[in-house]
Amino acid sequence: VYDKGNGSGDRDRIGEVLYNRGMVAAMWTTEAIRNAMKIHGTKEVRGEHVRDGFEALNVDENRLRELGLPNFTYPVKITCENHEGPAKVAIQQWDAKKKEWKMITGFYDSMRDIVDPLIEEDSMAYAKENGITPRKGCEL
């Protein structure tokens, strides 16, 4: 992108945490829209179509390679029941001499047995406080 003159912002930001997060978010969103077009048989997707695309998102190692992002992030599979995917975390450390972030751990699994009930409880409370009827079922 930058080599073709299409980059935005400072090229030195490439590889920084926020840059990488933006790249991953853009890739997931693009793949979800691609799924939405396939699922609904249209290039003119609406919000609910994109939701369905996200809920059928499966970016495995092969797809990461095809996208030119091998080892950039971990594979992700999103479903209606699980909007987070694997919910992994890693730790990075700033190297002041090289002026770059370095991954200092691999990816760890989150403590779903602890976190999921808290998310469910808070989500139900939010829905009740705001008069929202929680969605039931995951049919397209």
Task: Please give the residue ranges for each predicted region.
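Segments of small-molecule ligand-sensing domains
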Residues: Y2-Y19, T30-I104, S110
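Short, cationic low-complexity segments
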Residues: G106-C138
